[in-house]
């Protein structure tokens, strides 16, 4: 897939396209081969596209490669920008065992009443 000829105006890069569509294998391949030496605003944009489209595994993959998960936390404090619920913040704030329980609840669109206030960085 080359995006240099008929560039999609919604995406600045193939990484942004792959992240926003949840193509985890492509995201991992790009990050492993190219690295993450992008400008900070591009990091934020790629992470936000994945978040807005609810690709949680892709988000975790980006975070594991150095993308800043506080971008999502900051996004959730500004609800005018995107209509999201606090339940998605839990994904980034939970320990591993709690994360799997919460992720299952999110997939089933169930509300989670408790939030752990510790970041795993």
Swiss-Prot record:
Protein name: Putative ankyrin repeat protein L215
TM region positions: none
Stretches forming ANK repeats: 10-40, 42-71
Pfam families: Ank_2
Keyword Iron-sulfur: no
Keywords: ANK repeat, Repeat
Entry superkingdom: Viruses
InterPro entries in the record: Ankyrin_rpt (IPR002110), Ankyrin_rpt-contain_sf (IPR036770)
């Amino acid at each position: 897939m080359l995006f240099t000829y008929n560039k999609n105006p919604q995406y600045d890069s193939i990484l942004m396209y792959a992240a926003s569509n949840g193509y985890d294998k492509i995201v991992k391949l790009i990050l492993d081969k190219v690295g993450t030496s992008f400008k900070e605003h591009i990091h934020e944009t790629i992470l936000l596209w994945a978040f807005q489209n609810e690709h949680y595994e892709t988000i975790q993959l980006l975070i594991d490669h150095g993308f800043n998960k506080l971008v999502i936390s900051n996004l959730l404090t500004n609800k005018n920008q995107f209509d999201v619920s606090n339940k998605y913040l839990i994904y980034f704030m939970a320990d591993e065992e709690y994360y799997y329980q919460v992720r299952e609840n999110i997939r089933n669109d169930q509300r989670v009443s408790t939030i752990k206030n510790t970041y795993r960085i």
